[in-house]
């Protein structure tokens, strides 16, 4: 057990001893007489929070079957009053969500508290308890009319849970001793349950996947391995749109339009020309999906390898991952080479839904040089921003973005979009980026091309990313005209006249505009449908 867990458990023992001096077990028993429990073990989804009333209401409206409330006061700033407030919010609903007390429970007194303050279910963490303690707490939970969700993180902990006759088991994909996430933990535990001759489901062990769930693909993966529920917390809190995110997780609903099936999916956002860890984290906190690092020595935004490594490490840690994820996801999507760019974009969206990615931008380097740099730095994608062509992609070991350079709208009467399309070859670059070309510059030009070309690419089932002259003020229009998979910004979020120096207010405004675009577009379509 890690020191932090030992410290928390020790503190909770002190907390319980103090609470017993203030509120007796008899007082709690009287309070329990006035509360009812409705919990049953078949739940499709769980969600968790420290419970402001508006969040509880939002989760309930989104279809949560259970709302998990943190009640540990010192480290997680929770309280029993938070849980009672959550119960009061959902009370009276015809199919109200169950309330789960999420805490470090080590004493039967805490179960009495849970029942008295409105809980239907409690979390029991195996790594905190002996088998004898677990048996005692499970029995006491059931005697109080509640259900015990028993959390395990390994096959060894599973055996302890099964010996205690636990039948509702949550597999935490996060190891509480190291805080590392392993998304295969649930599958390993599910296999172990079957190997022990037990079934998964209503008549056997009800299995829940906890932690790290960020996409519909994750949900499908756990459903296939036998899980009957999921717990989603931080990902929902960061999403900004609980209802839409829950629907996406559970149903994978997409909307289509005449401009192509990607048009009304959330646009991805890449912030490029990042030169410091501070800038990267600011972009990530505001919702950036990709962080771009310039590896071209002639660029004013060039980053030395040591700083690039620090930025890449910070991005991985922010996304709670230790290595690349896109390559593995691409393998599952590219078993069939047909509809090449469509399949690649699906994989990119899935990867970005799990964690932000790091892109290294190169100009006229050899495949050997780019492979070596990508491995040393820890890149997820290699962006080709020079005159490399497409064939070089065969020799690059990482997913690639190929930039196509288009003229500035002010410098030409028009562009032959069909001729541009002819430059693209399937089966080579994974993604296409449309950017503006300016003599003497490759990227970061601050000028725009004709955004209608991006729309032509989308209609031709060549979904692309779009860069060139994008700013917080014009990105919504660019998205509305071009319908790209995502947008790429660099100079548009910088301090004027200072390449590589990000204006964090502009970064936040740009990313907010990208996020808000989808809500505006969806509202417009809904209004048109009603009319």
UniProtKB/Swiss-Prot annotation:
Metabolic or biological pathway: Amino-acid biosynthesis; L-tryptophan biosynthesis; L-tryptophan from chorismate: step 3/5; Amino-acid biosynthesis; L-tryptophan biosynthesis; L-tryptophan from chorismate: step 4/5
Record's signal peptide: none
Region (N-(5'-phosphoribosyl)anthranilate isomerase): 255-531
InterPro entries in the record: Aldolase_TIM (IPR013785), Indole-3-glycerol_P_synth (IPR045186), Indole-3-glycerol_P_synth_dom (IPR013798), PRAI_dom (IPR001240), RibuloseP-bd_barrel (IPR011060)
Region (Indole-3-glycerol phosphate synthase) residue spans: 1-254
CDD domains in the cross-refs: IGPS, PRAI
Assigned keywords, A-Z: Amino-acid biosynthesis, Aromatic amino acid biosynthesis, Decarboxylase, Isomerase, Lyase, Multifunctional enzyme, Tryptophan biosynthesis
Pfam families registered for this protein in UniProt: IGPS, PRAI
GO biological process: L-tryptophan biosynthetic process
Catalyses which reaction(s): N-(5-phospho-beta-D-ribosyl)anthranilate = 1-(2-carboxyphenylamino)-1-deoxy-D-ribulose 5-phosphate; 1-(2-carboxyphenylamino)-1-deoxy-D-ribulose 5-phosphate + H(+) = (1S,2R)-1-C-(indol-3-yl)glycerol 3-phosphate + CO2 + H2O
Single GO term (MF): indole-3-glycerol-phosphate synthase activity
Key word Amino-acid biosynthesis present: yes
EC numbers, comma separated: 4.1.1.48, 5.3.1.24
Family: In the N-terminal section; belongs to the TrpC family. In the C-terminal section; belongs to the TrpF family.
Function noted in UniProt: Bifunctional enzyme that catalyzes two sequential steps of tryptophan biosynthetic pathway.
Protein name: Tryptophan biosynthesis protein TRP1
Gene symbol of the encoding locus: TRP1
């Amino acid at each position: 057990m890690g020191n932090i867990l030992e410290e928390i458990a020790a503190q909770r023992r002190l907390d319980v001893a103090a609470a017993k001096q203030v509120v007796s077990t008899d007082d709690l028993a009287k309070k329990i007489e006035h509360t009812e429990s409705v919990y049953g073990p078949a739940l499709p989804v769980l969600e968790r929070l420290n419970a402001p009333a508006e969040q509880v209401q939002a989760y309930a409206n989104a279809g949560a079957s259970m709302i998990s409330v943190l009640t540990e006061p010192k480290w997680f700033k929770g309280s029993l009053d938070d849980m009672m407030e959550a119960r009061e919010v959902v009370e009276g609903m015809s199919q109200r969500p169950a309330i789960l007390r999420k805490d470090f429970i080590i004493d039967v007194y805490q179960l009495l508290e849970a029942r008295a303050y409105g809980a239907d279910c409690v979390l029991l963490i195996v790594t905190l308890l002996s088998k004898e303690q677990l048996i005692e707490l499970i029995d006491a939970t059931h005697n109080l009319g509640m259900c015990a969700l028993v959390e395990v993180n390994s096959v060894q902990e599973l055996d302890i849970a099964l010996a205690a006759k636990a039948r509702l088991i949550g597999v935490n994909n996060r190891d509480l001793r190291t805080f590392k996430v392993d998304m295969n933990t649930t599958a390993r535990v599910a296999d172990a349950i079957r190997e022990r001759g037990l079934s998964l489901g209503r008549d056997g062990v009800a299995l829940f996947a906890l932690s790290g769930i960020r996409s519909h693909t994750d949900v499908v993966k756990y459903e296939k391995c036998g899980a009957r529920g999921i717990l989603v917390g931080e990902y929902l809190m960061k999403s900004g749109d609980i209802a839409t995110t829950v629907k996406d997780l559970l149903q994978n609903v997409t909307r289509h339009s005449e401009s192509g099936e990607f048009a009304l999916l959330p646009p991805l956002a890449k912030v490029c020309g990042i030169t410091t860890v501070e800038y990267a984290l600011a972009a990530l906190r505001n919702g950036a999906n990709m962080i771009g690092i310039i590896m071209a020595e002639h660029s004013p935004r060039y980053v030395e390898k040591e700083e690039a490594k620090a930025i890449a490490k910070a991005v991985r840690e922010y996304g709670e991952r230790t290595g690349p994820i896109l390559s593995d996801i691409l393998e599952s999507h590219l078993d069939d080479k047909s509809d090449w760019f469509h399949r690649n974009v699906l994989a990119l969206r899935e990867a970005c839904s799990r964690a932000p990615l790091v892109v290294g931008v190169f100009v006229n380097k050899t495949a050997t040089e780019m492979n070596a740099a990508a491995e040393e730095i820890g890149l997820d994608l290699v962006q080709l921003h020079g005159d490399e062509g497409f064939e070089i992609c065969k020799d690059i070991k990482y997913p690639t973005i190929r930039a196509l350079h288009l003229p500035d709208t002010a410098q030409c009467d028009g562009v032959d979009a069909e001729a541009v399309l002819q430059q693209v070859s399937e089966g080579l670059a994974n993604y296409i980026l449309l950017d503006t070309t300016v003599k003497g510059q490759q990227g970061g030009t601050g000028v725009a091309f004709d955004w209608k070309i991006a729309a032509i690419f989308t209609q031709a089932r060549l979904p692309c990313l779009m860069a060139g002259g994008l700013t917080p003020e014009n990105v919504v229009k660019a998205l509305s005209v071009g319908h790209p998979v995502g947008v790429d910004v660099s100079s548009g979020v910088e301090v004027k006249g200072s390449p590589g120096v990000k204006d964090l207010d502009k970064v936040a405004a740009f990313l907010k505009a990208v996020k808000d675009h989808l809500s505006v577009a969806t509202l417009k379509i809904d209004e048109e449908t009603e009319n």
